[in-house]
Amino acid sequence: MENVQTYLPYLRGYDYTGKMPVVLDFYATWCGPCKALTPSIERLAKEFEGRLKVLKVDVDKNEPLARAAAIRSVPTLFFIDIDGNIERQMGAMPYDALRVKAEALVGAAG
């Protein structure tokens, strides 16, 4: 899984217009639900490798990004399509629900 540090300049303003949709996982190391979500996020990254970028954002280490994204609770997931549109999901999700969201993003990307 790639580290969000690489993408900080790219993510400013959420003007993503890349060739691949993105799932951003805003988390904290001390957050129980975030820890529970991690295996599902890692599985999603492996299953959709090459078709979907999955990035993790530690809100304590990336406060400017978390503040800009108005993250008020963790985990918060951003599902970003290739046009840069963001669908926000607060709270942990079961893997099957994550997979449905990922399939929709990848399918819309063509």
Stretch-by-stretch model annotation:
Residues 44, 55-67, 99:
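Structural microenvironment flanking redox-active thiols in thiol-disulfide oxidoreductases
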Residues 19-22, 26-30, 73:
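Short pre-active-site segment immediately N-terminal to redox-active cysteine/selenocysteine motifs
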Residues 23-24, 54, 77:
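Hydrophobic beta-strand anchors of alpha/beta hydrolase catalytic cores
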Residues 35-48:
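Typically the conserved alpha-helix immediately C-terminal to a functionally engaged Cys/Sec
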Residues 68-72:
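A short glycine-leucine-enriched loop at secondary-structure breakpoints
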Residues 1-22:
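A short beta-strand-turn-helix
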Residues 32-35, 78:
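Cys/His/Pro-rich metal-binding microdomains
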Residues 73, 78-110:
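Non-catalytic, surface beta->alpha helical segment in thiol-disulfide oxidoreductase systems
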